[in-house]
Amino acid sequence: MGKRYYCDYCDRSFQDNLHNRKKHLNGVQHHRAKKAWFDNFRDAATLLNDERSKEVCRKFVQTGQCVFGTSCRFSHMSEKQMKMLEQKIDDEKRQKEDPDQDGSSERSVDEWLSRREKKLAALTSGRVLRMEEEECTENIEIPPYLLSIPDLPPSLHPPPAGGWRVTVHNEWG
């Protein structure tokens, strides 16, 4: 049995030789799967421009489905969906123009440096526990979309209300 070629776009494998690979890469199924893959990464502005340039799909409007699916040359987006997409684009533009406008939870470098200096000073003077208590009481903002993910790994769960218990192990083994 020879080597096998696996196509990530189509999720299938076949014997790897020049004829089979060329036949697959030029096939309609591969082109559709590849287009669908790259369409997942298109930004909202290009998606909106493409949908606006298309006419509305009458079959989709009448029945709620279209036999051509994503390869249909007509638009399947409603006016409401287009408005939501426009709003998303406007929000992204505002975010790029002024990222500090909405009071993002990201800290500046100066804040980080001042906190680092406080920690180092606390370590030298022995006030480590008090500093950790102050950090736990800070207001931690968790993005709402993060909590909506069903199987979130434990490392991404928000910290408990009282903070984690700190245990100091002086001995190894």
Swiss-Prot record:
Its main location: nucleus. GO terms for cellular component: U12-type spliceosomal complex. The keyword Zinc-finger applies. A zinc finger (C3H1-type) spans 51-79. Residues 83-111 are annotated as: Disordered. Keywords: Metal-binding, mRNA processing, mRNA splicing, Nucleus, Spliceosome, Zinc, Zinc-finger. It is found in: Nucleus. InterPro entries: U1-CZ_Znf_C2H2, Znf-CCCH_4, Znf_C2H2_sf, Znf_CCCH, Znf_CCCH_sf. GO terms for molecular function: zinc ion binding. GO terms for biological process: mRNA processing; RNA splicing. It holds the Pfam family zf-U1. The keyword Zinc applies. Component of the U11/U12 snRNPs that are part of the U12-type spliceosome. This is Zinc finger matrin-type protein 5. The lineage of its organism: Eukaryota, Metazoa, Chordata, Craniata, Vertebrata.
